[in-house]
Regions:
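Class I SAM-dependent transferase core
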Residues: 1-40
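Short proline/glycine-enriched turn/loop segments at secondary-structure junctions
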Residues: 216-222
Length: 234
């Protein structure tokens, strides 16, 4: 962060998710390609859903492309950490934060009448519960031929960063529905999707909601394979 993106301050509590930078910046680059393909090249305004304490996507998007961001989160402490990072790096003119007061909502209560975003980005919670997160760690350890009597998560992250009632599927489908309610306030909506099996259902839902274009963008980092699904109503 300090060497390649010229960030002077990037600190947050160890309890919060520490994002791997290559995957995050890869998302930013793919979004840039998407915007250019739609001839959206000037005055880019990005909505970052679930900014988190690290404020990682706004920082990278500003460093790489000088985009302007609005970051949202349901956790006030995460927003306080993110705001400190913004202030210490003199980015308050480019990045602003909004608190989502209702954890069941994603865009509702956040978007304003005069908002006009070029794109929305989102890295949704993967798991339904902490138990599911621990089970994922257990499977990982077995794959590495490691045995542990007491299995704990092998990654950091607070509850709102890692799990959501109904898991990734429920979060994403809530996001799809709400995006249709605010179709004039954002040109492209996007999200990371970790489970490939969810994509078919997303396409079906988006077509019913009236999306005019839907794209799947493949992402690969080492052995990790993921994807971005992007859609627009315009």
């Amino acid at each position: 962060m300090f060497k390649y993106y010229h960030i002077e301050f990037w600190e947050f509590d160890d309890a919060h998710l520490c994002p791997p930078i290559p995957g995050r910046v890869d998302y930013i680059h793919h979004v840039n390609t998407l915007l250019k393909s739609s001839k959206i090249i000037d005055q880019i305004h990005v909505l970052d859903i679930g900014t988190g304490a690290s404020c990682i996507y706004p920082i990278l998007g500003q460093a790489e492309y000088q985009w302007n961001f609005v970051g949202t989160d349901i956790d006030k402490k995460s927003l306080e950490c993110a705001q400190k990072i913004i202030n210490k790096n003199n980015l308050s003119d480019a990045i602003t934060l909004r608190h989502q007061q209702d954890s069941s909502q994603i865009l509702k209560g956040i978007l304003k009448e005069d908002d006009r975003f070029s794109v929305a980005i989102c890295n949704p919670p993967f798991y339904k519960s902490e138990a599911e997160a621990i089970a994922a760690t257990s499977r990982k350890l077995k794959g590495l031929n490691k045995d542990s009597k007491e299995v704990v998560r092998n990654f950091s992250g607070t509850q709102n960063e890692l799990w959501y009632k109904g898991g990734e599927k429920a979060f994403i489908h809530n996001y799809l529905y709400e995006s249709a309610l605010f179709k004039t306030r954002c040109i492209w909506f996007t999200t990371l999707v970790s489970k490939k099996d969810l994509v078919k259902g997303m396409y079906a839902s988006l077509k019913k909601l009236g999306a005019t274009d839907i794209k799947t963008i493949s992402m690969e980092q080492g052995h990790k394979i993921s994807r971005i699904v992007a859609w627009t109503f315009q």
